[in-house]
Amino acid sequence: MILPGDPKRCAKIAQYFDDPVLIADNREYVTYTGTLDGVKVSVTSTGIGRPSASIAMEELYRCGADTFVRIGTCGGMQPEVKSGDVVIATGAVRMEGT
C-alpha cells in the first residue's frame, strides 16, 4: 500500500500502474489498485495527520494489506536536508497534539 495524505495524489500515482482501477472514492479516502511489473499494488489516501492515517492503516490491515509506505511532504529540522531531497525517516517528533 502506497499512502499519500492528499486524495489528489492517488490518481497521479496510479497513472504509473499497469491497468489502474478506481476502487473507492469517499471524502479523504481514494483507492486505486493495479500492478507494477506484475505485482499487485494499491494507493490509498489517508487524509492529513496521525489520527486519520491511523484509521486508514488499521482498516487496510483488516482488509488484508500487510505492507505500507507512507509518502508525502513534511517539515524538517536539519539544515543539510534540502527541498526535494528524499528522506527515509527512522523516527519523528510528534507535535500534532494528539
What are these regions (language model features)?
Residues 1-98:
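Metabolite-binding pocket within alpha/beta catalytic cores that recognizes anionic/polar moieties
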